[in-house]
């Protein structure tokens, strides 16, 4: 994930906090590029990246636990501003000679702090509401530091070493519950780190096109095309960079939404004048998935088979060296790092065979979903395509829970088409981040006409979100839900019950598998 040297960068080091991706997002919202990296990154790597500032994230551990995460203390001697958040502040205190101890009880939730007017709190009121989440507490600050905020529960809510530009806060400025959190981060980024905030989709395109051209040269690239937003944006970006050196492979694996295959060929083959090949691999995928019910195994099989299909097509084309994918930053984060447990392996990052014959190109793997949409608009992709519903690489294969069969796929395909049609008719497409139907591996008793039925249950999932990292269930009007339910039960065979998922993320994920 190298950036051009002239690009301003705030480096976020990951200590396992559930909020660490939010830090990255908040910085980017200010027009400054930010990346999340493992805390074990070397000093040489940091120097090579040349960040304007470094943020140490929070984390669930105690700095005194055996094997607790740490950093090379030389980071503090690089002359680069550092901001430690919660665990990051406690670690900074410990490494620089202060004292930290286990608190009698964990402090979690809203708190009031009293802040002094300094660089970090410039222009902000003295009394502020913040969000605390920590089990350790600082009891003595290192030499050269002073207190810049306190609270009823701690004398050290925020500290600074003004000379070395090292800061620490015992709360989470990145979460919405912290009243002036964005302002504090903005002060760090702009006042302390002297960033100008010039990161835009326009200069992202310029940088990526140049990187693609330098890497590819006169060689050829295959793009994994699904018709979804991510792969569409990747295809258009690559086409803009290398033109006819790009061949798009659209694998129709039989796990697509209703009418999706024909739409992809029409929009991209004809509309964008791209070289696109449609491969009918339905039987191939269904044979591989026969008898498989474990979701992780399904994802791996689909990911592997995708690449094998590309291998076959590439051998026909000759001279293809690269495979392009629409991997997002959320895919990379959710697939796990050393500090974070894998939530689920993503098709784009976790299902690739070790004997793959391609070099990977993932030009949007540093972007969140909303940023990809902005990129798509900047590239000239029509809004109705940019705002299409997110669709996972494994397709309906992970929306049929348990073993996949043709009959089950048809239930999901038809019920999903009804859901999307009603949402569109009600004008809710832009209000809801993602919506789809799933088929849980359960049946229930019902009555249709004068007869007892024992048929499938369809689940509706609709969520609101900004970037897909967190979400809440959409508060769809009851009459609209009733309309959707009635149509599904009456128009889709072998369905006698419809349920609505009202779970947020976390604790659940958006997809059911």
Curated annotation (Swiss-Prot):
One of its GO terms (cellular component) is cytosol. ATP binds at residues 226-232. Residues 9-198 form the Glutamine amidotransferase type-1 domain. SUPFAM superfamilies: Adenine nucleotide alpha hydrolases-like, Class I glutamine amidotransferase-like, GMP synthetase C-terminal dimerisation domain. The active site is at 86 (nucleophile), 172, 174. It catalyses: XMP + L-glutamine + ATP + H2O = GMP + L-glutamate + AMP + diphosphate + 2 H(+). Its EC number is 6.3.5.2. One of its GO terms (biological process) is GMP biosynthetic process. Pfam families: GATase, GMP_synt_C, tRNA_Me_trans. GO terms for molecular function: ATP binding; GMP synthase activity. Pathway: Purine metabolism; GMP biosynthesis; GMP from XMP (L-Gln route): step 1/1. Gene3D superfamilies: 3.30.300.10, 3.40.50.880, HUPs (3.40.50.620). Residues 199-388 form the GMPS ATP-PPase domain. Keywords: ATP-binding, Glutamine amidotransferase, GMP biosynthesis, Ligase, Nucleotide-binding, Purine biosynthesis. HAMAP family: GMP_synthase. Catalyzes the synthesis of GMP from XMP. Homodimer. This is GMP synthase [glutamine-hydrolyzing]. It comes from Staphylococcus aureus (strain NCTC 8325 / PS 47). The gene is guaA.
């Amino acid at each position: 994930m190298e950036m051009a040297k002239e690009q301003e960068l705030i480096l976020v080091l990951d200590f396992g906090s559930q909020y660490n991706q939010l830090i990255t997002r908040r910085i980017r919202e200010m027009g400054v590029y930010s990346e999340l990296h493992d805390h074990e990154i070397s000093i040489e790597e940091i120097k090579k990246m040349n960040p304007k500032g470094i943020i140490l994230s929070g984390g669930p551990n105690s700095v005194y636990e055996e094997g607790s995460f740490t950093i090379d203390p030389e980071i503090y001697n690089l002359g680069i501003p550092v901001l430690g958040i919660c665990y990051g502040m406690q670690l900074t205190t410990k490494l620089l000679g202060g004292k930290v101890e286990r608190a009698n009880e964990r402090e979690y939730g809203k708190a009031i702090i009293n802040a002094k007017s300094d660089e970090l709190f410039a222009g902000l009121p003295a009394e502020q509401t913040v969000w605390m989440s920590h089990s350790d507490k600082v009891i003595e600050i290192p030499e050269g530091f002073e207190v810049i905020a306190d609270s009823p529960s701690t004398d050290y809510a925020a500290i600074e070493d003004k000379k070395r530009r090292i800061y620490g806060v015992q709360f989470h400025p990145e979460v919405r519950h912290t009243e002036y959190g964005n302002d504090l981060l903005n002060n760090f980024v702009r006042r302390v780190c002297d960033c100008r905030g010039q990161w835009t989709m326009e200069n992202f395109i310029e940088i990526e096109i140049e990187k693609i051209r330098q890497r590819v040269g006169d060689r050829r690239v295959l793009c994994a095309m699904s018709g979804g937003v991510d792969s569409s944006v990747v295809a258009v970006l690559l086409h803009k960079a290398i033109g006819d050196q790009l061949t798009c492979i659209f694998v129709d694996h039989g796990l697509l939404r209703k009418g999706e295959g024909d739409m992809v060929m029409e929009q991209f083959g004809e509309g964008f004048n791209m070289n696109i090949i449609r491969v009918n691999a339905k039987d191939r995928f269904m044979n591989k998935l026969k008898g498989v019910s474990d979701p992780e195994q399904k994802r791996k099989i689909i990911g592997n088979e995708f690449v094998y299909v590309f291998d076959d097509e590439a051998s026909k084309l000759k001279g293809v060296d690269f495979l392009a994918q629409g991997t997002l930053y959320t895919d990379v984060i959710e697939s796990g790092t050393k500090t974070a447990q894998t939530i689920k392996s993503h098709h784009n990052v976790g299902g690739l065979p070790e004997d793959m014959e391609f070099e990977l190109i993932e030009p949007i793997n540093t972007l969140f979903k909303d940023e990809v949409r902005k990129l798509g608009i900047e590239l000239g992709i029509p809004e109705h395509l940019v705002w299409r519903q997110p669709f996972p690489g494994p397709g309906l294969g992970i929306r049929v829970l348990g073993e996949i069969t043709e009959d089950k796929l048809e239930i999901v395909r038809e019920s999903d088409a009804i859901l999307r049609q009603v949402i569109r008719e009600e004008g809710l497409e832009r209000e809801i981040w993602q919506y789809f139907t799933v088929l849980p591996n359960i049946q229930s008793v019902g009555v249709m006409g004068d007869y007892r039925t024992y048929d499938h249950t369809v689940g509706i999932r609709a969520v609101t979100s900004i970037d897909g990292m967190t979400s809440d269930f959409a508060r769809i009007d009851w009459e609209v839900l009733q309309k959707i339910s009635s149509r599904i039960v009456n128009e889709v065979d072998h369905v006698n019950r419809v349920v609505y998922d009202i779970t947020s993320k976390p604790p659940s994920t958006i997809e059911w598998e």
